[in-house]
Structures are given as C-alpha cells and as structure tokens.
A protein has these predicted regions:
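Non-transmembrane, membrane-proximal soluble domains of secreted or membrane proteins
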Residues: 30-59, 79-334, 340-346, 363-379
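Hydrophobic single transmembrane helices highlighted by the model
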Residues: 53-72
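Exoplasmic/lumenal beta-rich domain surfaces
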Residues: 356-359
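Alpha-helical transmembrane segments
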Residues: 66-85
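Transmembrane alpha-helix boundary/anchor motif
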Residues: 24, 74-77, 122
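N-terminal secretory/membrane targeting signals
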Residues: 1-32
Length: 379
C-alpha cells in the first residue's frame, strides 16, 4: 500500500510538472515571453543560413530532452522501487552483484548510436548547406569582402569599382540587397576576429594569413545587429557593426550615392576664422560601458537608418568649411579617407558619406551631434 501511495503521489507531481512544461513550450511561441526576440536573437532568425542552424539546435534539444526524460524516469523508478524503508532494510547486505545484462548493454549502445545518427544527419546537411552558396543560387550571389581591424570592420564591394579609387569601401555598416545570397570573404589585418550576425548566420572566424568566407541572406529588408565574437583585445566587447538589407531600388540608390564623391559645399565668403562656432547640446554623463545607443526608435531601425541617407537639410556652409579646415589642421586626413576631397588616409575607417551612417565609433554610438561631439573629444 505504501508503494502504491508513493507511486500515486509521484504520478500527481509528474502531471503537474508536465502541465507547467506544456505551458512553457506553448509560451515559447511568443518570443517576448522568454525575451528571445532581441537584436541578437538566435531564435527569431530571418535568413536561410540561420534557419538551418536553428533547426539543428532544435533537433539536438529534442533528442537530448527524450534521453533526459527516459534516464530520469528510470532513475526515479529505481529510487522509489528499491528505497530502504525500514532500519533493517538499511542495514541489509546488498544482493549478489552480477557482471551486467548483455541485452540491456547492447540495447543502450544501439540507442546511443541511434541518437547520434538522428543528430548527425541534420548537422551534416547544415554544414554542407551553410559552407557555401547552393549551386542553383550562385548566379544571383552578391559578393562583399569584410576585413577585421582592432576594433572595427571594413566592407569592400569588389563589383562596385570607382574610377581612380578602387572598390567601394564602407565601415561598420554593411548594406546588402535583401532576398539575394551574399558571399562574404573574411579577412583580418591584425588578430583573430569573428564575424557574427545572429539573425542571419552563425559566426565564422577571421584568421590572419588565411582566406575564409561565409554566406548569408536576409529574406526581407531589415536592420540587423552584428558583433565580433572572438576576444581580440581591450575593446573587443564594443567591436560591433550593422547589416542593412534593402529592396532592389533602395539598394541601387544607395550604391549610386556611395560611389559618388563626398559632396563639396561652396565655402562662405567670410573668412573661416569668422565663421560661427558649433553650438553643442549639453553632454550627459555616461556611466562606464554605457553605449548611448537608443533601445527604442520612434520608427523602425531601418526607417531611422534611411533618414540618415539625406543629411543635407539645414546644413550651414560656414560650419562645413570650418569642419573641413579642422579636418586638415588636426591631421585627420592622415588616417581617414574622404573621397573627392583629397583626403586619402588608409589606417582608419573611411569617412566618405559618414553622415549617411546611423552609427559611429564602431557602431557603438548613434550618429548624432551629441554622440559625435562626445566621440571626437574622448574617443
């Protein structure tokens, strides 16, 4: 009777646990419930490469869950069934131990092999699928070269050649056409970095003196967060970038803008030294490691990025002339390129069309007056 009572109680608790588990699994359909829909979510994916990797994760989870339940059930049964219930049973001599049961041992080995095969098949398929663009889609592939520096990313577009300037180059914001496979050649000029856009593809390392690559695709236009995923020095944690996927027309318009020289504005007739000075807003005090990135936008992140593509509204030619003079005076041109103005530095990120970017400082800060002032004064 006592055993029956124990088993009945165990059954009651098991039903309660299963009910809680069922509610949890159903709730998982809503990514917000588990806070799995963040900027770097690997669960709410938006591309075929990340989707194939997520499928492997799910298969592995289900297989291990089944194993966990079976092993746990046998362990629970043995613990209840053969528990010593009296002082005499606690002091009893254990029964004679045998060498084992060949049938059970062979069965367990077979079950283990089966579990590994179930995991291995989708894993191998995903490895082959994610290694390179599928043959039937290679004709539609767009190619980009990503180069890691301490601590920023450079993106070159080999198919977009600019007369006298080589391939189109940008920094920290990778703009791609949505709905097309993108092959990204991975390079580094210093240490090992790792290129990772969680919603679009798993990470792949950038290794010195070694050519590496990955491919990804954004199914729809969108704004995605990327990150270096390999410790690469003091500022590794803030080595970030963005991926912006655009529709065909928007992407072609962006290419047209980016392959053009940086605009030149006629200087004012007054001397630069007499030009009005920049009036900056009061700078807030940032805590250590606070990024300054807005968590919520009044509009979508993609629309916020698009708003940066036409930054000429309200421009002041006098201030532009003053800034250009300061750019020369402070020797910014020794590191940074501004195409069309004779500034051809190569060691730092290109600043051509800098105003069209939504971020600065390695995609750590928003590109606005306050954050730009903060960055220039204390990089």
């Amino acid at each position: 009777m006592r055993l029956a009572t124990i088993l009945s109680s165990a059954a009651h608790w098991s039903r309660a646990v299963l009910a809680v588990g069922a509610v949890s699994l159903l709730s998982a359909c809503d990514y917000n419930f588990w806070r799995m829909d963040g900027h770097q979510s690997t669960i709410k994916v938006e591309g075929p490469v990340a989707k194939s990797q997520l499928d492997v994760f799910y298969v592995t989870c289900w297989v291990t869950l089944v194993i966990f339940i079976l092993v746990g059930a046998v362990l629970a049964y043995a613990s209840i069934k053969f528990k010593a219930r009296t002082p005499e049973e606690e002091k009893a001599i254990p029964p004679e131990q045998g060498h084992g049961n060949p049938l059970i041992e062979i069965g367990l080995i077979g079950a283990s092999v089966l579990a590994l095969v179930i995991i291995a098949i989708p894993t191998l398929k995903a490895i082959w699928y994610t290694y390179d663009v599928p043959e039937d889609r290679k004709a539609d592939t767009y190619e980009v070269t990503a180069t890691g520096y301490q601590w920023w990313f450079k993106f070159d577009y080999p198919s977009e050649q600019i007369a006298g300037a080589g391939a189109l180059s940008t920094a920290n914001e990778l703009v791609i056409p949505a709905g097309r496979p993108i092959r990204i050649n991975l390079r580094t000029v210093d240490v090992i970095h790792s290129f990772w856009v969680p919603k679009l593809a798993g990470k792949v390392d950038m290794i010195p003196n070694r050519a590496n690559h990955l491919w990804l695709q954004a199914d729809q236009p969108g704004y995605y967060w990327g990150q270096c995923a390999e410790f690469c020095g003091d500022s590794h944690a803030v080595m970030r970038f963005r991926v912006i996927a655009l529709g065909p027309k928007d992407f072609n318009d962006w290419l047209t803008q980016q392959t053009s020289p940086a605009r030149d504005v006629a200087p004012p007739r007054i001397a630069t030294k007499d030009a009005p000075k920049v009036q900056f807003a009061s700078l807030r005090t940032f805590k250590q490691n606070e990024t300054g990135i807005t968590a919520k936008y009044d509009t979508s992140p993609l629309d916020a990025w698009k708003a940066h593509q036409f930054p000429e509204k309200g421009e002041n030619p006098a201030l532009i002339a003053q800034g250009k003079a300061l750019f020369k005076e402070k020797a910014c041109l020794s590191c940074h390129e501004v195409r069309g103005h004779g500034f051809a530095g190569i060691s730092g990120p290109t600043l051509t069309h800098f105003g069209s970017r939504s971020t600065l400082a390695g995609a750590l800060l928003e590109n606005n007056t306050e954050q730009l002032h903060r960055w220039i004064h204390n990089p």
